[in-house]
């Protein structure tokens, strides 16, 4: 997962916790400068949370598909959490609350805030934990994939070296074949030359024998 996304994530979780506390504090205050200041702080914090959500969204969409899916799933939980904070802020900052209903609003707001926030953050924590586990599995799968890729590359390199060795041996054998062919041609030429010489010698011998016979016959006749 992206370190940038995790940085935004930590900032948002801290900000969300602080905003939840401030909403609870503001809900028990009477109308006055203190409450107005608290509401202004909450409004500023919610704006900051909106910015962090947008940054996380942009960062998540720039990641690889496997990491992108995990980050977008987390982001949905954070958006849901922020929407709940906005509802609490709207209820706390409502200027239309009547004095007669302020006690009821404060009690119901506090109860709802505690119940919803606890439930929301419980589900959020569980979702984040599951997503972290998924991230760990994805990282482990990626590590195994990289190791497998390295082994594959090593095998390909070994096969390439073996191929080069075989090609070199083939070239040597081809050279030996050429030498053998040349030797055969030389031996064939020598054999033909020897055969031709043999016929020449035989012809000379026959001619000499005939000459000797003729000479002897001539002498005997005279």
UniProtKB/Swiss-Prot annotation:
One of its GO terms (biological process) is protein storage vacuole organization. GO terms for molecular function: SNAP receptor activity; soluble NSF attachment protein activity. Residues 68-95 form a coiled coil. It is a single-pass type IV membrane protein. Disruption phenotype: Altered transport of storage proteins to the protein storage vacuole (PSV). InterPro entries: GOSR2/Membrin/Bos1, SNARE, v-SNARE_N_sf, Vesicle_trsprt_v-SNARE_N. GO terms for cellular component: endosome; Golgi apparatus; late endosome; plasma membrane; SNARE complex; trans-Golgi network. The keyword Protein transport applies. The modification N-acetylserine is found at residue 2. Residues 2-199 are cytoplasmic. Residues 221-222 are vesicular. Expressed in roots, stems, flowers and leaves. CDD domains: SNARE_Vti1. Belongs to the VTI1 family. Forms SNARE complexes with the t-SNAREs SYP61 and either SYP41 or SYP42, and with a much lower affinity with SYP51 in the TGN. Also interacts with VPS45, a Sec1 protein, but not with SYP21 or SYP22. Binds to EPSIN2. Core constituent of the SNARE complex required for membrane fusion at the trans-Golgi network. Interacts with SCYL2B. Together with either SYP41 or SYP61, required for membrane fusion; the fusion of phospholipid vesicles containing SYP41 or SYP61 and VTI12 is triggered by YKT61 and YKT62. Functions as a v-SNARE responsible for the docking or fusion of transport vesicles within the trans-Golgi network (TGN) and mediates liposome fusion. Necessary to deliver proteins to the protein storage vacuole (PSV). May be also involved in retrograde traffic to the cis-Golgi. This is Vesicle transport v-SNARE 12.
């Amino acid at each position: 997962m992206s370190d940038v996304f995790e940085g935004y994530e930590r900032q948002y979780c801290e900000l969300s916790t602080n905003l939840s506390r401030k909403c609870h504090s503001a809900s028990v205050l009477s109308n006055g400068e203190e409450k107005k200041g608290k509401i202004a702080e909450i409004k500023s914090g919610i704006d900051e949370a909106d910015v962090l959500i947008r940054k996380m969204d942009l960062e998540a969409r720039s990641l690889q598909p496997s990491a992108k899916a995990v980050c977008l799933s987390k982001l949905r939980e954070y958006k849901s959490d922020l929407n709940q904070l906005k509802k609490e802020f709207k209820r706390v900052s409502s200027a239309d609350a009547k004095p007669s209903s302020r006690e009821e609003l404060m009690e119901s707001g506090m109860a709802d805030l505690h119940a919803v926030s606890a439930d929301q953050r419980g589900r959020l924590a569980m979702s984040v934990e599951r997503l972290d586990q998924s991230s760990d599995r994805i990282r482990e799968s990626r590590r195994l994939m990289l190791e497998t890729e390295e082994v594959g590359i090593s095998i390909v390199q070994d096969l390439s070296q073996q191929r080069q060795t075989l090609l070199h041996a083939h070239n040597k054998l081809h050279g030996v074949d050429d030498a053998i062919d040349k030797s055969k041609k030389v031996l064939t030429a020598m054999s033909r030359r020897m055969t031709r010489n043999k016929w020449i010698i035989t012809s000379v011998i026959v001619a000499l024998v005939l000459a000797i016979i003729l000479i002897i016959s001539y002498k005997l006749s005279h």
